[in-house]
Regions:
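C-terminal catalytic domains of large/alpha subunits in multi-subunit enzymes
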Residues: 1-185, 189
Length: 192
């Protein structure tokens, strides 16, 4: 119910009246991030309002006969500033990390000779599934690290940065493959 002076109407009536009278109920705005600059020629400046830091360690296993791999464990610590909602931040960190695993291990774009994208949906474009989440997944939010910049309650955004932490999984796989090669490399004794 909307009240204005002695008049009242429901929200539905108000929306319909606006539609009938061609009154837009939407708005557009722009945000200019403060304190950012970049000089491409000097390769100097501050391209971001603030930075967030994180670190990750992953443990992986690979089947040398089939090439199938699994992530066994991931340990992540992430700087969130003064977290507004630790559960949401943890979800963002988990999601970004798993998205990164997909980017580095199973997602591929295929195009036909005319340039048309062929991997258009779940049947042709493989994304991470529930088995790609490590059975042991430890996330810690770095404590006592309020943002130095004047952000909302000195928080930091953590939606995209954890994507790059998944490089730890790629490097764990690389290490596992190199160990396999170390023990399976042909030698003169093997008749090579």
């Amino acid at each position: 119910l909307i009240l204005s002076g002695n008049k009242s109407m429901t929200f539905k009536e108000l929306a319909f009246s606006c539609w009938e009278n061609r009154i837009s109920l939407s708005s557009t705005g722009f945000y200019k991030t403060p304190k950012i600059s970049w000089d491409q020629e000097k390769f100097k400046g501050s391209p971001y309002f603030y930075f967030t830091w994180g670190a990750a360690v992953s443990e992986a296993i690979i089947d040398i006969d089939t090439g199938e791999s699994r992530i066994l464990r991931a340990d992540i610590i992430q700087d969130c500033g003064s977290s507004l909602n630790p559960l949401i931040d943890r979800g963002q960190i988990e999601g970004g990390f798993i998205q990164g695993i997909g980017w580095l291990t199973c997602e591929e774009l295929y195009f036909n000779p005319e340039g048309k994208l062929l991997t258009l949906g779940p049947s042709t474009y493989k994304i991470p599934g529930s088995r790609d989440v490590p059975p042991e997944f430890n996330i810690k939010l770095l404590e006592n690290t309020p943002n130095e910049e004047k952000t909302i309650f000195r928080s930091k955004a953590v939606g995209e940065p954890p994507l790059l932490l998944s490089i730890s999984h790629f490097l764990a796989l690389k290490n596992a493959v190199s160990i396999c090669l170390l023990y399976t490399s042909p030698s003169p004794r093997d008749g090579w």
